[in-house]
Amino acid sequence: MPRAPRCPAVRSLLRSRYREVWPLATFVRRLGLEGSRLVQPGDPKVFRTLVAQCLVCVPWGSQPPPADLSFHQVSSLKELVSRVVQKLCERGERNVLAFGFALLNGARGGPPMAFTTSVHSYLPNSVTESLCVSGAWMLLLSRVGDDLLVYLLSHCALYLLVPPSCAYQVCGSPLYQICATTDTWSSVPAGYRPTRPVGGNFTNLGSAHQIKNSGHQEAPKPQALPSRGTKRLLSLTSTNVPSAKKARFEPALRVDKGPHRQVVPTPSGKTWAPSPAASPKVPPAAKNLSLKGKASDPSLSGSVCCKHKPSSSSLLSSPPQDAEKLRPFTETRHFLYSRGGGQEELNPSFLLNSLPPSLTGARRLVEIIFLGSRPRTSGPFCRTRRLPRRYWQMRPLFQQLLMNHAKCQYVRFLRSHCRFRTANQRVPDAMDTSPSHLTSLLRLHSSPWQVYGFLRACLRELVPAGLWGTRHNERRFLKNVKKFISLGKYAKLSLQELMWRVKVEDCHWLRSSPEKDTVPAAEHRLRERILAMFLFWLMDTYVVQLLRSFFYITETTFQKNRLFFYRKSVWSKLQSIGIRQQLERVQLRELSQEEVKHHQDTWLAMPICRLRFIPKLNGLRPIVNMSYGMDTRAFGKKKQTQCFTQSLKTLFSVLNYERTKHPNLMGASVLGTSDSYRIWRTFVLRVRALDQTPRMYFVKADVTGAYDAIPQDKLVEIVANIIRRSESMYCIRQYAVVQKDSQGQVHKSFRRQVSTLSDLQPYMGQFTKHLQDSDASALRNSVVIEQSISMNETGSSLLHFFLRFVRHSVVKIDGRFYVQCQGIPQGSSLSTLLCSLCFGDMENKLFAEVQQDGLLLRFVDDFLLVTPHLAHAKAFLSTLVHGVPEYGCMINLQKTVVNFPVETGALGGAAPHQLPAHCLFPWCGLLLDTRTLEVFCDYSGYGRTSIKMSLTFQGVSRAGKTMRYKLLSVLRLKCHGLFLDLQVNSLQTVCINIYKIFLLQAYRFHACVIRLPFGQHVRKNHAFFLGIISNLASCCYAILKVKNPGVSLRAKGAPGSFPPEATRWLCYQAFLLKLAAHSVTYKCLLGPLRTAQKQLCRKLPEATMTLLKTAADPALSTDFQTILD
């Protein structure tokens, strides 16, 4: 029998998802004597290959094979597969084998497919079709019989390995939907996992010895007992087992399957606690009860943790695949971009506004917060169950909370704490759209400290002292409020952080009876969870609603992910100015009510987009968010909206396919740094091959309003020429890829592959092999799951959809509806590609001669011309200045840069910014040496920004490991060949680039350290942090070697030698420069770093040291001095 492919990473991935993973031959052999005859002498090679490559995966909770298993074949293969597909469809199970099949109903008519009574195929399934006609599978059926093959297809998951390192799924639940056991346990704190406790610490920062082995798969090392300060955190995510009597009064919680996923009580008090000695039954996962993006009504959020009664039908060997994830997050995105006018008042629909300040209202509030009842804004209160005594006793306190809310003067607090920072404290008139008035309005944002003062005043007015228990608990919560509003756009605040150092025993309202001398552990954990529910509701509902009611919160174009807080009265005026400017700048036609209705009736699948604005330094940038404004709630067109999204993705995939097949369509367009590197490297090597390097003339130009100025007729003509080709029938295959990286992280991605009938790979084995051959780095150690395949996408249907997309996109602005008469809709995946195709056609027709002996690059709407001919440079500049109306191309002279003199009046009186002939020329984040053509990275964009805000770091669980992984991932992105290639750049330039990369990493290192949770400090485990710095140096040098194959960097005494000690010296120097500015925090690191650097100095040659000191000259890194952190 052929040797089975090894594919160790795929096998490891499958073992983390399934209870058992066996080769097919082994699985069948374990079932009895007849199974040992699966492979026999003389079997065809294709059958032997199938048996060798097939893996049988048994899911957790799967029933065993039938006891009376027969190895006799009764049915044909096609009949058997059809019966299995029908059973899967009837049970409503998602199974790869049944993708593309559905039960017949009124909407899906037609005769059933063969051997079924009520199933039809609405999309091809290449896996199922190839299985039905495969001779190897027919032979397998004859060997194993109907019973076993039905069991394998219905209850197991089959995978076929595809050398060298991948596999594809044949049947079973899609792998991307199966929760990993290892991932589940990572969400449960160490103290409550079924492991034997030995040394270590809570944040898993590890020792120096652990760091060396961290690149390998971790063994299941037992975890340490938590420190005193973290005991409460651990009990939040544990479950207790109260007695049977307690169960009557303290109902357990379960997750309601309703739309808001609230936590509701069940009559059972049984819960689960993991035992080190046995494999436990595991309850289903608790849901994250944060808003899940429904920020428009934060009052609907409720409880935060739940308990489940395990199913009596679950196997004793069931894994923790659905173990509780009692660590929800409240996210800053919940209070972003709030709607409404300029009214500064609490939303009338807010929960506390709808409850009367009485014991009845208090009871309802207690049920919503702690028992998961859904909030009701109208109608009589219904008593569906008796309130447990513990919660009954809480009513007076929550009645006091409702009374405090009713008399709280929110507007007075707002005006007191969030005053306008102007002399006369008046907001400029919104009717004045002059730049000075717009700038003055943009400066009227409230600082986080002012917003915190407002929230603190409201909370102190609202929450009775009895609910806090002590001032200590109140101060802890207020500190978390201040932290919450200081986070960046994508940040989260976890429940563990919210409960850290909160004293549960001080909250007497949590007790169900008078205090005894000792409190059982189960009772203490229950009180802890109840307090967590209240604090989470207070933060995720009340605080978020206050922010959404009184502020418009948004990011800006100049401060990365930092959030700016504008009072509603200020933002309404800013928005009015932005709308007027948008209507003046863009050709929009307002639709009448009849036209809007006609649009809804005719173009059911087209979305109605919404317009919002992002502040700039001196203006507002309009953002048309197509995915945000689908408006399915208003029109009830969810399925049509999904159809639109799928059609948009299909069109995008087809245009990308044509772009790849015909690269000239994109003209001079580059899609990123890798494209720029490939083209720039070829150009530099060609220029340096000349006898004498000519002087180069540089032109940088930026198109004004590129998306809004493109003529629609011209764009339609260009796209029609692309997809109206002879091979205009496209095949679209949608598939998922699941892979595990070197750090053990599992990643899922969903992709589309376009082909024509001439290059179609019809079967999944061929397709997976083709993917590995075409791009082995992108598809390595992966499992491929086919989702669907469409064989009849015609160019005419795609063009019809494109016409609708361009000419009938409706934007809703300030309650009115407009259709765009010129330009292309922004905010979709197509926008950038369409812009590149339009300007690519312009370049092919107008600028072919300009590129002679030179190079023309364009990143979306930013042009760069490098040419040895001054006449070509001037002609190119003149053409762009005068504009190309046919393509809507007009450049912004204020952003145009050249390195040669331009005669006065040559461009109609205007003059671009002129740099010296020899300089570092800026373009799209790069600095290009105009004489040597070497490349540096431009770090000026980091000036006056916060690295802490730009770096999203969620370090609650395994903070140290997360920090190390984050820093290494960012380093790999920054160490690009464009900066490290020694054929493009000199060794000195590469040294400067490496040093600046390390210096930026030092800033990121500091940003991660100051955000470590639970009071973790560098001094507690300085060896770990020194290991991170050392790992960064080693990783950078490894990348440097990969980017320079064939170059001997270690050659001693050679002019281009660059040993690993040199990289390490640059790394230590960069970190010493940054960490010395925070000497109190990093005192324990500075000494070892200085000692290690001195040791390196003794090893490195004098010439190398001179080179390194030149690269680390502070005069070359002045951009970093303006970084805020």
Swiss-Prot record:
A motif (TFLY) lies at residues 332-337. InterPro entries: DNA/RNA_pol_sf, RT_dom, Telomerase_RBD, Telomerase_RT, TERT_C. It comes from the Eukaryota. Residues 929-1125 are annotated as: CTE. It is found in: Nucleus, Nucleolus; Nucleus, Nucleoplasm; Nucleus; Chromosome, Telomere. Keywords: Chromosome, Cytoplasm, DNA-binding, Magnesium, Metal-binding, Nucleotidyltransferase, Nucleus, Phosphoprotein, Ribonucleoprotein, RNA-directed DNA polymerase, Telomere, Transferase, Ubl conjugation. CDD domains: TERT. GO terms for molecular function: DNA binding; identical protein binding; metal ion binding; protein homodimerization activity; protein-folding chaperone binding; RNA binding; RNA-directed DNA polymerase activity; RNA-directed RNA polymerase activity. The record marks Q169 as: Required for optimal binding of telomeric ssDNA and incorporation of nucleotides at the second position of the template. Residues 1-239 are annotated as: RNA-interacting domain 1. Residues 240-328 are annotated as: Linker. Its main location: nucleus. It holds the Pfam family Telomerase_RBD. Residues 402-422 are annotated as: CP motif. Residues 273-287 have a biased composition (Low complexity). The modification Phosphotyrosine is found at Y697. Phosphorylation at Tyr-697 under oxidative stress leads to translocation of TERT to the cytoplasm and reduces its antiapoptotic activity. Dephosphorylated by SHP2/PTPN11 leading to nuclear retention. Phosphorylation at the G2/M phase at Ser-447 by DYRK2 promotes ubiquitination by the EDVP complex and degradation. Ubiquitinated by the EDVP complex, a E3 ligase complex following phosphorylation at Ser-447 by DYRK2. Ubiquitinated leads to proteasomal degradation. Isoform 1 and isoform 2 expressed in thymus, liver, spleen, lung, kidney and testis. High level of inactive isoform 3 in adult hippocampus, low level in heart, cortex and cerebellum. The modification Phosphoserine is found at S447. It catalyses: DNA(n) + a 2'-deoxyribonucleoside 5'-triphosphate = DNA(n+1) + diphosphate. Catalytic component of the telomerase holoenzyme complex composed of one molecule of TERT, one molecule of WRAP53/TCAB1, two molecules of H/ACA ribonucleoprotein complex subunits DKC1, NOP10, NHP2 and GAR1, and a telomerase RNA template component (TERC). The telomerase holoenzyme complex is associated with TEP1, SMG6/EST1A and POT1. The molecular chaperone HSP90/P23 complex is required for correct assembly and stabilization of the active telomerase. Interacts directly with HSP90A and PTGES3. This is Telomerase reverse transcriptase. It comes from Rattus norvegicus (Rat). The gene is Tert.
